[in-house]
Amino acid sequence: VIPEGYTQENVAVRGKATQSAQLRGEHAANSEASNAIDGNRDSNFYHGSCTHSSGQANPWWRVDLLQVYTITSVTITNRGDCCGERISGAEINIGQHLASNGVNNPECSVIGSMATGETKTFHCPAPMIGRYVVTYLPTSESLHLCEVEVNVDKPAAA
């Protein structure tokens, strides 16, 4: 719930994204970490607006917001052309540390399941302070995200 007199802003679009390992080969350009913060919720991987890890164990994706924010929720758009079940069990962690690539930062939420192509908002139990937002998948599945929006409450313009 957005407090009265406030509006919500996605600060991820100004950040810098990276991931554990990028898919290689003919679809490498479609797989870049920055695709998930381009402001485009297109969920078809082949349209070039999603990210895709290579098939290594425990893949992660991270956005550096370039400054510290108080984060209320994270909105994720799941891949829509196939494989939507792969995201099940992914963790959303938020914090100020890069140790272990940020996967040990405090947990905002766990993605139980998402439909293929679904956009869903995950609310942190309380506002969280952090610079790094990490989506970590503790399996050997590929991690693909079509959009990640990091939501902060800002005072509304008068």
From Swiss-Prot:
Disulfide linkage: 50-146, 82-83, 108-124
Binding site for alpha-L-fucose: 52, 79, 86
Lineage: Eukaryota, Metazoa, Chordata, Craniata, Vertebrata
Subunit structure: Homotrimer.
Source species: Anguilla anguilla (European freshwater eel)
Motif segment (Cell attachment site): 79-81
Residue numbers spanned by region F5/8 type C-like: 16-148
Note: Binds 1 calcium ion per monomer.
UniProt cross-references to InterPro entries, sorted A to Z: BG_Antigen-Binding_Lectin, FTP1, Galactose-bd-like_sf
Binding site for Ca(2+): 35, 38, 40, 49, 146-147
Family listed: Belongs to the fucolectin family.
Protein name, entry field: Fucolectin
Pfam families: F5_F8_type_C_2
Any one of the GO CC terms: extracellular region
GO molecular-function terms, A-Z: calcium ion binding; carbohydrate binding; fucose binding
Cellular location(s): Secreted
Role played: Acts as a defensive agent. Recognizes blood group fucosylated oligosaccharides including A, B, H and Lewis B-type antigens. Does not recognize Lewis A antigen and has low affinity for monovalent haptens.
Keywords: Calcium, Disulfide bond, Lectin, Metal-binding, Secreted
Matches recorded under SUPFAM superfamilies: Galactose-binding domain-like (SSF49785)
First-listed, main subcellular location of the protein, grouped into a coarse class: secreted
GO annotation, biological process: regulation of cellular defense response; regulation of complement activation, lectin pathway; regulation of innate immune response
